[in-house]
């Protein structure tokens, strides 16, 4: 038997089947860095319209986790896709560097500032630590294939950035938004500092749930409000609270003006309780025999006096809208020093603002009964005092959501302390922000309602902190009037210049007389630092407005859903406070990373997926494919099994690219591309399909629907290519003459397709796309990322896509019939079969038009199409209106193409070949029109 293998055009490529991503990716990353690919991308887009995605700065502390990877990869996909669309899309990464987590890590090593180490030395250690963390995270982000200006990032501890934070504060002062006040703020005892809303986590906590009797000083004035002649006896207004430790600061009891309150006659006392709560309250007190003796609105009791339950002072009844009947008694214990609602009520009624609790969380020494006791341990003592005085009506434990410090995970308290605030209402800032929210595109759209609700309900923003490592508030306050220095704005700019030169130590080391001269003796120098959310929040000012390569406002901010209360909020608030407009046009939000069951990832739960392990084991491109495969608008599941599924999808994509490349091994696009008019119809269909798909993919990129791109590309590889086009072209590609029109037509199509396909992949599978790009024949650009979306398509005459869709459907039905025949043992491969398709009037012309090439559609040795009317009796009709008859071929098998043909053996020189193969190896170019 002659050997004909060498007469075939068998595929050949240096592009390996095994990806070995964990080895190749670092090599490619080093090559990108050595060649300065990011800088070359920027140079290639000079003068183009800009697209600015502004990076929300991660905190410079610790190694990256899967949530970081999700965020940065999503951003990278956007930046790269916009670059392919022709935009100048720079990416300037950032890091958030001040604040408590860094302080805590430094404290573990050197102790607290002011004890074992000076504050100045402590700040230097914090700066050093943050810089080391940036180096770690920079390498880890780059390992993910994220391109950006990594060695020119914005860093909130850079001197020029710190100076701009100070300048931003000055601009907000100029616009009338800063005020000082003695207000209740979230206070972390462990931090020893106020915290912002964004630094508060709500977790379940067990607390005492108690009802306390406040007795009427003059029961008669209460009873008279019910309009009946009632016997005078003790009258109680009971309150319900889960924070007994706040009772020493009680200054009032609050009712709702429009709620109906019932007068309950029980035993030897009256009780006034919200009508809707009477039954539950009486049950809680164990009182089964009682009667309702009247009803009145809460407003009628305003200013009546009650006796404090354990102090010799009287407190008034006051009114407010925040009182509800969802729980409790309808009467709310009010301590202006320990809650925002209480504070506002206290301001309205001019109640005393007395704070009995010190910064360390203990009652002050002058607090009667509880001096020196920690508020976190005081509840038991307070309950004992209440019980001793017979004013504890009910007591139990309750599990409820309670604010905790985001860093220490410890319960927080509301504490009235002297702080600095951005007023939400003083200069109509709240309404201005709400107006700007309406102008922003929120994706998903529920983000608008979420941030609107937060802005509408947020208290004034406490921006001062009592910390060592942070940007200072460079303010001087008059010792007597407590007013800011009249030259505050000029002084702030002077300090900003100093910080720009020497960093924040310039303020902390400053002697007031250096700026104020003789005035210094009249002013206190403020030592507070600023909220880190203000640091990152003014990046629109320090970065977008001060970097000539960027624009304000940004086109996109893109972060996790928790940033509606964090960076989205602080950025919006500061931008509107500074110059009246939102800092972004579109806000995209992604969900949290969770496990396969939707549970939070946790090392203690054993479901934590380590990012470095994933990258080292599978490669960054598998992780990038996972990101693209998810609908990021919801929670994003990750597990080893999910990653393995993505690895399977990756292999299909890689194998598709490898097949295309392997069949271009002898193709020179400069000389071997054929004219579009000579392309076979199947190749024209494939090119048209790619062009249409590219339009869909670009639209999906523009709409940030990356999971749809994943689905489209996977379907393209599996269906359009794998089970159809690439299957059909094998015979033509391998068996026809090397330089034949039939073969070059296929190669021309594959060349255009692989170039387009690779660019589609590049925003997602960045390393793999670059590897493919460098293997494509021809003179290609140095990096795929300098390219645009593919636009060098040949001009394709009209292709009837519906006809080919019908042929595809019929082929699928034929494959089913072939498989059934194979299962019965009647044939081996499809080439051992001959097929007759009986088709209806709609399908028949589409099949008969292919003539002798119909067999190449089914990859059988013979095929013909006949009218459905000629179908043998009993032959089933498929859903697409055809009947299929499969028979085993009786002819000999060609040793070269493996088709079983009647003419095998008719050529004496090549007795093992069919005449088609004889012609192909003898220099005769087989002619094809369709397949």
Curated annotation (Swiss-Prot):
Cofactor list: Zn(2+)
Entry binding sites for ATP: 603
Cofactor binding comment, as recorded: Binds 1 zinc ion per subunit.
Entries under Pfam families matching the protein: Anticodon_1, tRNA-synt_1, zf-FPG_IleRS
Motif ('HIGH' region): 58-68
Binding site for Zn(2+): 894, 897, 914, 917
PROSITE patterns according to UniProt: AA_TRNA_LIGASE_I
Keyword set, alphabetical order: Aminoacyl-tRNA synthetase, ATP-binding, Cytoplasm, Ligase, Metal-binding, Nucleotide-binding, Protein biosynthesis, Zinc
A GO term from the CC aspect: cytosol
Known catalytic reactions: tRNA(Ile) + L-isoleucine + ATP = L-isoleucyl-tRNA(Ile) + AMP + diphosphate
Motif segment ('KMSKS' region): 600-604
EC category name: ligase
Matching InterPro entries: aa-tRNA-synth_I_CS (IPR001412), aa-tRNA-synth_Ia (IPR002300), Anticodon_Ile_BEm (IPR033708), Ile-tRNA-ligase (IPR002301), Ile-tRNA-ligase_type1 (IPR023585), Ile-tRNA_ligase (IPR050081), M/V/L/I-tRNA-synth_anticd-bd (IPR013155), Rossmann-like_a/b/a_fold (IPR014729)
Domain notes: IleRS has two distinct active sites: one for aminoacylation and one for editing. The misactivated valine is translocated from the active site to the editing site, which sterically excludes the correctly activated isoleucine. The single editing site contains two valyl binding pockets, one specific for each substrate (Val-AMP or Val-tRNA(Ile)).
NCBIfam families, A to Z: ileS
Record PANTHER family: ISOLEUCINE--TRNA LIGASE, MITOCHONDRIAL (PTHR42765:SF1), SOLEUCYL-TRNA SYNTHETASE (PTHR42765)
Family recorded in the similarity comment: Belongs to the class-I aminoacyl-tRNA synthetase family. IleS type 1 subfamily.
Subunit structure: Monomer.
Its biological purpose: Catalyzes the attachment of isoleucine to tRNA(Ile). As IleRS can inadvertently accommodate and process structurally similar amino acids such as valine, to avoid such errors it has two additional distinct tRNA(Ile)-dependent editing activities. One activity is designated as 'pretransfer' editing and involves the hydrolysis of activated Val-AMP. The other activity is designated 'posttransfer' editing and involves deacylation of mischarged Val-tRNA(Ile).
Name of the protein described by the UniProt record: Isoleucine--tRNA ligase
Source species of the chain: Legionella pneumophila (strain Lens)
